[in-house]
């Protein structure tokens, strides 16, 4: 039986969630704006600032244990109306760069995450067409055991990557649908997918591909913003919602362009809050409530 997403949702049943679980990729973003090394404490402070400023306007906030979740809890900056999602993935990749592989983080204790107030667990799968579905299923099963142990909803994110074998063909738009179909067997309570066509071009084409993802995955799903330019994201969310998505769980499109600002909290208030409010209005109007998915 699918676990309820009530604690992650707006009163409308739509999901308007902010991600700030980026780790080395976030360090790389800050490094582009400064000549000095980016310490862990700078990443933690950014996550605390995001939680303090944006959580009153988000239905949930996704945070990692490595740099964020304990500081956010200790400093009591999360709005009571905002659910907390704990990232349970270990991101493998170069310092200051994007993840190239993932694993279940052995240091994430699902019972501790639940006891400090988390209302969901998230895991990232990097999907390549030349890697075996069996290996992905093994990872997902390990993650789902954490969710079963804690009783927390399972949120599975998929990012489709080009194959490691460069001789193999790669059709991103088609493989978004193939990956969603595979994920329909993973017992996720919520699926997190990339926006078709990176949110650019014909809105109707985006909606049509979103409908295909809806039909393939069979569970509530939301879009992420990685790969979508911020000016296109609101329209992309609307197009995907019209295709059956239940909202968004996004980071970069909400806050990436204020990284490096001299006053991060002020920039979040000036730039990110209006953006988030607009996105919330869109999903309230167009998204399919998670509870309507049977």
Task: Locate predicted features.
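Alpha/beta catalytic barrel-like cores
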Residues: 1-119, 124-129, 187, 231-232, ...
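Aromatic/hydrophobic pocket-lining residues that form the small-molecule binding cavity
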Residues: 47, 106, 136, 140, ...
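Catalytic beta/alpha-barrel core
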Residues: 60-65, 121-135, 171, 175-203
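Active-site-adjacent beta->alpha loops and helix N-cap segments on the catalytic face
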Residues: 67-75, 128-151, 198-214, 230-233, ...
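Short beta-strand/loop segments at the ligand-binding rim of alpha/beta enzyme cores
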Residues: 81-84, 150-155, 215-229
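Structured alpha-helical segments in the cores of large, soluble enzyme domains
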Residues: 106-115, 140-150, 176-183, 209-214, ...
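Hydrophobic, aromatic-enriched interface-forming segments
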Residues: 143-166, 170
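Short, catalytically relevant binding-site loops at active-site mouths
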Residues: 160-164, 191, 197-200, 229-230
């Amino acid at each position: 039986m699918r676990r309820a997403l009530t604690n992650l949702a707006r009163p409308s049943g739509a999901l308007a969630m902010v991600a700030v679980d980026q780790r080395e990729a976030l360090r790389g973003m800050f490094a582009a704006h400064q000549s000095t090394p980016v310490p862990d404490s700078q990443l933690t402070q950014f996550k605390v600032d995001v939680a303090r400023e944006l959580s009153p306007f988000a239905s949930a906030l996704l945070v990692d244990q490595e740099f964020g979740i304990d500081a956010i809890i200790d400093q009591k900056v999360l709005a009571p109306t905002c659910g907390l999602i704990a990232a349970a993935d270990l991101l493998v990749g170069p310092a200051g760069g994007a993840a190239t592989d993932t694993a279940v983080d052995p240091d994430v204790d699902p019972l501790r995450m639940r006891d400090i107030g988390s209302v969901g667990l998230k895991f990232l799968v990097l999907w390549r067409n030349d890697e075996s579905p069996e290996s992905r299923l093994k990872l997902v099963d390990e993650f789902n055991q954490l969710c079963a142990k804690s009783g927390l909803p399972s949120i599975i994110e998929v990012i489709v990557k080009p194959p490691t074998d460069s001789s193999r063909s790669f059709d991103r738009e088609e493989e978004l649908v193939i990956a969603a179909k595979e994920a329909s067997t993973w017992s996720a309570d919520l699926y997190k997918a990339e926006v078709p066509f990176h949110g650019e071009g014909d809105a109707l084409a985006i909606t049509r591909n979103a409908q295909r993802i809806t039909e393939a995955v069979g569970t509530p799903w939301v879009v992420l913003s990685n790969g979508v330019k911020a000016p296109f994201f609101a329209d992309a969310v609307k197009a995907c919602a019209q295709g059956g998505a239940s909202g968004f769980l996004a980071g970069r499109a909400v806050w990436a362009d204020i990284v490096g600002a001299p006053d991060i909290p002020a920039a979040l208030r000036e730039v990110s809050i209006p953006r988030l409010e607009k996105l919330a209005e869109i999903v309230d109007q167009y998204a399919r409530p998670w509870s309507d998915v049977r």
